[in-house]
Amino acid sequence: MNPPFDPSFGGYRHFARPGTTKLPLFRGAPLIGGETRNFLDVALYVANQLFLLRGLVGPEVTPALLFPSFLLIPALGVLDRTLFLVARAEHYYVVLVCMTVAAANDLWIAGAKLTWCFIWFWAAASKLNSHFPSVIMFMMNNGPFFPHFLKKRLFAHFPDDLRASRFATLMAHFGAASEAAIPVVLLTAAATDNDLLRIAGCLLFTGFHGFIGINNPNGMPVEWNILMIYGGWFLFGFHPEARLSDLTQMPLLLAALLLSLAVVPTIGNFFPSKVSFLL
């Protein structure tokens, strides 16, 4: 979607510009509650980007390098809820917290594994609706590698009836079931020390996210699918020794993870107007 635009990324052009629109957490509060970005908003955003860049180019990612962003990202969320959501804090910030507070004994790997598993679970749950077959229909129709003769089968009766066909519905259900199966397979492999099952789970999420990525879906972050593959192989493929039960060594971290990954999304599914699914 972005090649027609130069540069092909533009978040900073909004968040680093005074006067642009924002959604403060405490509307009307002095200094932080305005509906347009001021120099405090810009300064904290730019500072966070520079701290992240320092961590990216550093020889080693340490808690000391991550700690400024550990503090700044929630602060930026208070200043602008939109910024907190577009930062994908429900995923990236949760893992950053694990890397900041649990790096000493590598418990952050177990925390990241828990995050990945819940992300797969809730992503699969979000597909259990009546409109997802239509999503599949358009995504596959736009995909450059999907056979042309199958593209027409995605529609009920092309070109007269452009609703999702049974074929598209079947693909949608298969996709949701595949995504839900990923954490089940990986956790079962960890519980049974089954290396073949672990590799099968890794191949499953590679195929799942890779399939989405190569179809160039509109309106969704392709880089997230790449990260799920890369992170999944690192966490589950190369670190089978890190178990979720290890998190009991840090009960406060475990409680915070369960609150963020289980409780908040559950509330959001029942009260979507109150709690964003991106939390």
Over which residues does each language-model region extend?
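Alpha-helical membrane-anchoring segments
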Residues: 1-279
